[in-house]
């Protein structure tokens, strides 16, 4: 093989290794990331997952940063975050969730794909390295909005459902960020998988402040 062919083959092998790792590794439990869920993504059938799930709704109450996060210490706000930032009512919130799936236990999980290089070494994809990346790009706000959008859509489709602590615990499993450059086939750790589950207290506030 020529040098170019060797390089292409190496890239394909690395991609296949990553893909098998992403799909075949038991996912960390967002409620307790040190533990594993009893399934991998390749065990979720097509009927129980949705890709590129778009959402769009009007913020009838506006968006007031200080009111949303005041007194909340479970997330790290970026230094450039302006607590006085606000948008008046009528602002439209929209986005797209990479993957939403329902697990065998009936809970729903949000998955987001990230190709961030971090420090270009697999060791950089440990919990601390991924946390720094989450804080740096404020992906925290992203999964909070995704979670709120999902619950809003679920409540709209199920009028009898009400957001309570018990209902939240039974319905939502959490969010999992897959930093794919740090994942490989047969890995024995959770490197590359950032799993988290926001508190009911925070989600309840966002749900009532952001949804109609």
Where are these regions (language model features)?
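Structural signature of nuclease core domains in nucleic-acid processing machines
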Residues: 1-212
């Amino acid at each position: 093989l020529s040098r170019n062919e060797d390089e292409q083959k190496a890239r394909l092998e690395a991609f296949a290794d990553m893909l098998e790792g992403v799909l075949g590794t038991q996912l960390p439990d967002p409620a307790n990331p040190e533990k594993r869920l009893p399934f991998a993504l390749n065990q979720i059938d097509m009927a129980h997952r949705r890709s590129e799930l778009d959402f769009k709704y009007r913020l009838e109450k506006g968006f007031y940063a200080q009111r949303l996060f005041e007194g909340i210490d479970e997330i790290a706000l970026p230094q450039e975050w302006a607590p006085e930032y606000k948008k008046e009512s009528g602002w439209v919130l929209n986005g797209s969730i990479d993957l939403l799936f329902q697990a065998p236990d009936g809970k729903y999980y949000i998955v987001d794909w990230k190709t961030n290089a971090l420090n270009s070494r697999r060791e950089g994809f440990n919990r601390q390295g991924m946390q720094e990346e989450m804080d740096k790009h404020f992906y925290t706000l992203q999964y909070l909005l995704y979670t709120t959008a999902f619950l809003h859509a679920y409540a709209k489709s199920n009028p009898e459902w009400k957001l309570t602590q018990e209902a939240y615990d039974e319905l939502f499993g959490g969010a999992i960020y897959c930093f794919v450059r740090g994942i490989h086939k047969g890995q024995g750790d959770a490197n590359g998988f950032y799993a988290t589950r926001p508190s009911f207290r925070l989600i309840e506030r966002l749900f009532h402040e952001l949804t109609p």
